[in-house]
Amino acid sequence: MVSDASKKKAAQKKAAAAAKRGGKAAAPSKSAATSSNGVDSLSSGVDALQISDRTCTGVLCSHPQSRDIRIESLSVTFHGYDLIVDSMLELNYGRRYGLLGLNGCGKSTLLTAIGRREIPIPDQMDIYHLSHEIEATDMSSLEAVVSCDEERLRLEKEVEILVQQDDGGGERLQSIYERLDAMDAETAEKRAAEILFGLGFDKEMQAKKTKDFSGGWRMRIALARALFIMPTILLLDEPTNHLDLEACVWLEESLKNFDRILVVVSHSQDFLNGVCTNIIHMQSKQLKYYTGNFDQYCQTRSELEENQMKQYRWEQEQISHMKEYIARFGHGSAKLARQAQSKEKTLAKMERGGLTEKVARDSVLVFRFADVGKLPPPVLQFVEVSFGYTPDYLIYKNIDFGVDLDSRVALVGPNGAGKSTLLKLMTGELHPTEGMVRRHNHLKIAQYHQHLAEKLDLELPALLYMMREFPGTEEEKMRAAIGRFGLTGKAQVMPMKNLSDGQRSRVIFAWLAYKQPNMLLLDEPTNHLDIETIDSLAEALNEWDGGLVLVSHDFRLINQVAHEIWVCEKQCITKWNGDIMDFKRHLKAKAGLED
């Protein structure tokens, strides 16, 4: 007899399948953009075309008034490719989830689907999806943060109207005051200022118009808005990408206290360890759940996979023995034939009950930079260099240092201290105001920075783009060169606009490596890379025999590859006496945060 639970599950799957055939989300809830808090309106504006490229189905199984979310039979398709198939999404109130998975598996697509309510999220749950920077307007950064709390502004305007009435507003006014008190409305501006300060905005910057900030700083303002609103569901996609190390430390400590539902995609293992209470792993088109932070996830996953492989091998050995026995004695004497039939029944029972699957291993990428040999020092030397974009404002003053092919240097310091400027002085893109930069005649420098992605012709496939960049190269040789950075098969020949940001980053690394430099300057190379790819990059850099200067907000990558930490601050460059984790503890102490 079929159980009620089985009937319910079958009905859910049937509903999901019907919705999928219709190309719409199952049981869609109305947008909360019209709700009292208006949070969703902040993250709206995705084109209809983008939405039509994505198909989502799922059945809400948790109670509509519950603070926890459980969606079964979840499937997500993007450009006709299945990203998630018949899985379960479970988000519990008070938990902070790290969403992991290889580049291109659909992490950002899943966040967008949740943020756009393309899967059934209860109406009373407000969502903030940090996906893009705020608009450039005449509003100050502080005003941009405070003004985003539409519910508070609406209630304060209603108070102004009610107090003018003859009855003084009555019960309605009292209920509004209670709500404003719960929202801590009187200290709204103070809270907004504290958040902005933590993200690197001093008082002068808080008064500055948003249109006068770069895209990276406007993304910080958008992050400040998300933290200020405190939505029920907060979705963050690589929130540390535009932050310096100091702001990363502050954000990590701030999110530790987020007591609603947080889902964060991050390539920083250190950040995930500090923030997350749970991990969701996207693998084989399924969502798998683990309790604990990133390190605990790694340990638990390793133990589970080891046990799974032991069970798999045992089952396969049993199956092999039984099949061999059946084939050998199935037509023998009556006694042996009965035993063979018994084993046949046992085998059929095992198969009906479901056999243990072989562990699906994530494909391990192996990056490789060609060895270039040594050059006699000095290779790159700064002699009493001063530099400023204007005569009245010097970023560096009388700095002296040298970098050789044995150097493995990480540049750290607050945003605006001149880390990227120093890299441009090294390449010759900028010239010193005073002093001299000496480069060896045979020094070949290659620089990675985020703006390289903007130069990619996204209409072209990666293979054709590389063939045009390096004319005369044989196609097979170029395929191999791109493949060394984890882009293989169809990914090489489809337009790059259909690749994930992480896959495009791999194209850039392949382009840099093909230049065969003997010194690499890497400015935030981990943005958009998954954790496995970052580990492969670190391994390749450690095996390479060239010089390295690194700017990164990823504490773990710095710890993996850097031999020296140079602090850029107050027009100077100072060598830090310790490793990067010592520097992190220093930043926490400086900000008055507990270790």
Curated annotation (Swiss-Prot):
UniProtKB keywords: ATP-binding, Nucleotide-binding, Repeat, Transport
Single GO cellular component term: plastid
Protein name: ABC transporter F family member 1
Signal peptide: none
Regions of compositional bias (Low complexity) in chain numbering: 13-36
GO molecular function, one term: ATP binding
SUPFAM superfamilies on file: P-loop containing nucleoside triphosphate hydrolases (SSF52540)
Span of domain ABC transporter: 69-309, 380-595
Family statement drawn from the similarity comment of this UniProt entry: Belongs to the ABC transporter superfamily. ABCF family. EF3 (TC 3.A.1.121) subfamily.
Binding-site residues for ATP, renumbered to this chain: 101-108, 413-420
Region Disordered, residue ranges: 1-41
Superkingdom of the organism of origin: Eukaryota
